């Protein structure tokens, strides 16, 4: 009888362990994925990644809020934790800039801006084995599933010249800027007036 009970307990524990293993999230799921044709696969679940910052881009020629867009920046959790420990971005870092339309509501005292429909995402990837310049940039509309790397002049040059840490705009990420300064990886020179126009 004891043997049967022990066997039943062992089977129960084995089944539980197997189910936990299956349901556990893949710790490497935030790494970049590519097709066989070297296109980047659209990152899924990025809204559960680490949120870094938002910006509202306003068109000076627009009126009544037209042409304004929000940008929300997310970074892969594994890269974020490595940055907090070292002040630098590890290989296979992934950033997502989510672009959304803006809706404005005015009152006598304030003008409020709200995020609305998804326009698309821009993805920044550090992959030293795949890209000669280490970082590459990809553009997705609201439904695109894969994308080729953008031309060098489209994104890389601005990021390389204006990024405070490697090719990234850490100067605009208030939770990371002090860490980069502490580790000595922060390029203070990028904080000139030109950097604010990026």
List where the protein language model places each region.
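N-terminal low-complexity, intrinsically disordered patches enriched in charged
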Residues: 17, 80-81, 101
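N-terminal post-signal-peptidase region of extra-cytosolic proteins
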Residues: 69-85, 107-109
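Generic detector of low-complexity/intrinsically disordered segments
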Residues: 8-9, 22, 42
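Secretory pathway targeting signatures of secreted, lumenal, and periplasmic proteins
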Residues: 50-74
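Positively charged n-region of N-terminal signal peptides that target proteins for export
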Residues: 1-5
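Sequence context surrounding c-type heme c attachment/ligation sites in exported
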Residues: 26-35, 40-50, 54-59, 86-198
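Signal peptide processing junction and immediate N-terminal pro/mature segment
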Residues: 18-26
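Bacterial N-terminal signal peptides
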Residues: 7-17
């Amino acid at each position: 009888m004891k043997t049967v009970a022990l066997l039943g307990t062992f089977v129960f524990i084995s089944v539980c362990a197997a189910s936990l293993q299956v349901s556990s999230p893949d710790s490497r799921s935030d790494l970049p994925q590519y097709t066989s044709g070297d296109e980047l696969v659209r990152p899924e679940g990025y809204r559960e990644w680490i949120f870094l910052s938002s910006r509202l881009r306003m068109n000076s020629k627009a009126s009544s809020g037209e042409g304004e867009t929000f940008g929300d920046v997310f970074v892969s959790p594994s890269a974020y934790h490595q940055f907090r420990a070292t002040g630098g971005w590890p290989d296979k870092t992934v950033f997502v800039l989510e672009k959304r339309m803006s809706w404005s509501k005015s009152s006598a005292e304030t003008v409020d801006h709200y995020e609305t429909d998804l326009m698309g995402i821009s993805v920044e990837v550090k992959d030293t084995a795949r890209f000669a310049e280490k970082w590459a940039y990809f553009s997705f509309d609201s439904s695109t599933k894969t994308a080729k790397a953008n031309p060098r002049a489209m994104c890389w040059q601005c990021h390389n010249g204006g990024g405070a840490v490697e090719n990234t705009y850490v100067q605009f990420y208030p939770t990371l800027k002090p860490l980069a300064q502490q580790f000595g990886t922060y390029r203070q020179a990028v904080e000139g007036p030109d950097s604010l126009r990026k």
